[in-house]
Amino acid sequence: MLILGSHVSLKGNDMFYGSVLEALEYNANTMMVYTGAPQNTIRKPIETMKIEEAHALMKEKGIDLNHVVVHAPYIINLCNPDPERRAFAVEFLTKEVIRVGQMGINQMVLHPGSAVGGNREEAVQWISEGLNQIIDNTKSYNVRIALETMAGKGNEIGKTFEEIKAIIDGVDDKSRVSVCFDTCHVHDAGYDVIHDLDKTLQLFDDIVGLNYISVVHVNDSKNELGASKDRHENIGFGYIGYDALLKVIYHEAFKEIPKILETPYVNDKPPYKLEIQMIKDRVFDNELKTKLEK
């Protein structure tokens, strides 16, 4: 079974229940949500999230809760050189992991962080130390933290497979960490998923281990290979291309894990229903953007 969905929003007063409704509108069987705004750390009380209603609807419609993903806010940086800011990041992510666990979700995607000042080895160490504290603070919640592969914009940590491995190596309880493989980021970081997907996956397996990949972000890229820009494009309309992304989506290595679209809106309209159908049909629709622009 193809496990495919997209980013969805918390919907007003419907909250998590509204997120499920949105995913169903796209004919998705999984989804990725934020527990609040991704640009800040303000969170509404967990009691307002309509979790029971969301779970009931997912069960009715055949969405496996084990395939649902949360994304942590972008602004959290576990490797900030300021000890107080690192402590805040640990404190907030501890609360976020608990919140994810209370929602019944078992994995949270996290951007590893940015090496402010440029010392990457020290940054990697701080990330591992922060993850150890978060995991130690949340032992009663079986939530994995999925480290996202990054494009390498600025001083982002996680551009190379070696950096992902180094972070994981520093984590004591490795059952609580995994990897989110982002196609746009990997491409922009310089790994060829167009012509050498199997070679790239073999390289990841040799360095980190394919068994660590627990979610795939499926995005095309507005930039050429190795650009380090991180600019997502709609499926088939970027430099990676439809055929290459289809190989990722249907690759045997990713058969049992969720594939999540994070492609840009077109004319303020979500493209996900059309993109999901195009992926299921296995035929590129070069009119997709035109349809959304009407």
From Swiss-Prot:
Give the cofactor note text: Binds 3 Zn(2+) ions.
EC numbers: 3.1.21.2
* Keyword S-adenosyl-L-methionine in record: no
What is the reaction catalyzed?
Endonucleolytic cleavage to 5'-phosphooligonucleotide end-products
Record keywords: DNA damage, DNA repair, Endonuclease, Hydrolase, Metal-binding, Nuclease, Zinc
Binding-site residues, Zn(2+) 1: 71, 111, 148
Per its Swiss-Prot or TrEMBL entry, what cofactor is needed?
Zn(2+)
EC class name: hydrolase
Entry binding sites for Zn(2+) 3: 185, 230, 232
Does the record's keyword annotation contain Metal-binding?
yes
Which biological processes are named by the entry's GO terms?
base-excision repair
Q: Where does Zn(2+) 2 bind?
A: 148, 182, 217, 262
Q: Name one GO molecular function term.
A: DNA binding
Q: InterPro entries recorded for this chain?
A: AP_endonuc_2, AP_endonuc_F2_Zn_BS, Xyl_isomerase-like_sf, Xyl_isomerase-like_TIM-brl
Q: One matching Pfam family, short form?
A: AP_endonuc_2
* HAMAP family xrefs: Nfo (MF_00152)
Q: Which PANTHER family match?
A: APURINIC-APYRIMIDINIC ENDONUCLEASE (PTHR21445:SF0), ENDONUCLEASE IV ENDODEOXYRIBONUCLEASE IV (PTHR21445)
| Similarity section | Belongs to the AP endonuclease 2 family.
Its biological purpose: Endonuclease IV plays a role in DNA repair. It cleaves phosphodiester bonds at apurinic or apyrimidinic (AP) sites, generating a 3'-hydroxyl group and a 5'-terminal sugar phosphate.
* Protein name in UniProt: Probable endonuclease 4
Q: What gene is it encoded by?
A: nfo
